[in-house]
């Protein structure tokens, strides 16, 4: 992905990695560990749902291969000599590391705990409420922001409606 970002001169090509990689890696981990227990499939479904929501949100805002995230443009302008290092380490390597570390608990679970024959029903219910609740909060926040940005009267303004009224980043709250 980093090489494609260099070829297209666009570090934003790396952005969908956050959501697309787990959609591919988690099913591979499930297959690799052979942990086809109910709760493992449920965890897979939650990850896929979360990743699908994030990917759709990215696709909605994606303009074309020439569109570069303004933060990357600003970073390159402020630190032109450090840019190659910032690009590979900060924009490409760090997200790869974060996704890898974020998926380690799933690998550990699929490798060990998922072989249990019984499921703690309270744990399942709590996981379902937290997992689905987070995805719902993120989806609602994404929809509210999309609606806000579509209104030409809101150019340059900060969204202070809906979930955004109570939190600067409600979609991140859903992540937690």
Give short role names for the model-derived ranges.
Residues 1-161, 168-176:
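Membrane-anchoring alpha-helices and their flanking helix-loop junctions
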């Amino acid at each position: 992905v980093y090489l494609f970002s260099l070829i297209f001169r666009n570090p934003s090509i790396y952005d969908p990695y956050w959501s697309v990689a787990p959609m591919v890696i988690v099913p591979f981990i499930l297959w690799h560990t052979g942990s086809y227990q109910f709760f493992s499939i449920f965890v897979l479904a939650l990850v896929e749902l979360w990743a699908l929501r994030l990917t759709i949100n990215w696709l909605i805002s994606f303009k074309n291969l020439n569109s570069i995230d303004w933060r990357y443009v600003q970073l390159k302008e402020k630190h032109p000599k450090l840019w190659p290092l910032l690009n590979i380490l900060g924009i490409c390597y760090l997200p790869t590391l974060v996704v890898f570390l974020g998926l380690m608990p799933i690998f550990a679970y699929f490798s060990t705990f998922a072989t249990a024959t019984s499921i703690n029903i309270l744990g399942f219910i709590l996981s379902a409420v937290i997992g689905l609740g987070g995805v719902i909060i993120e989806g609602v926040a994404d929809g509210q922001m999309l609606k806000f940005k579509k209104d030409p009267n809101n150019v340059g303004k900060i969204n202070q409606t809906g979930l955004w009224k109570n939190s600067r980043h409600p979609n991140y709250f859903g992540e937690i």
